């Protein structure tokens, strides 16, 4: 057990253009080496491209993509005796959103050759249509949790 106090939740201010805090969370994950302006440019170009390709509101596509990729359960390693079990646990909403963003960006970074905003656009559109690498990752996690359901009583 940690002897420190629990960390206070930080309030995420919405982004300046779309006034959306989810978009700001994604920008913070896209950002590398403190280059937030570049992260904003990637995200806004991606939003423009989504609007062109789908003829829908890009914020709706973004929220639907995040909702589709957000996991409900995950597995965590737990040592009991000498063996390690993969124990399925429910995911809190904040952690689920963070995992979804992380998986979408990991899927984008895995592909090489195209600019980041195009990769992000394609991945978000795929995720909103329930396909793509991030959805596969979510399904894999859910399958692993289903396989280890027997260890659910080994809670933390």
Swiss-Prot record:
Keywords: Plastid, Ribonucleoprotein, Ribosomal protein, RNA-binding, rRNA-binding. GO terms for biological process: translation. The keyword Plastid applies. Pfam families: Ribosomal_S7. GO terms for molecular function: rRNA binding; structural constituent of ribosome. Its main location: plastid. InterPro entries: Ribosomal_uS7, Ribosomal_uS7_bac/org-type, Ribosomal_uS7_CS, Ribosomal_uS7_dom, Ribosomal_uS7_dom_sf. It comes from the Eukaryota. One of its GO terms (cellular component) is small ribosomal subunit. It is found in: Plastid. Part of the 30S ribosomal subunit. Belongs to the universal ribosomal protein uS7 family. One of the primary rRNA binding proteins, it binds directly to 16S rRNA where it nucleates assembly of the head domain of the 30S subunit. This is Small ribosomal subunit protein uS7c. It comes from Prototheca wickerhamii.
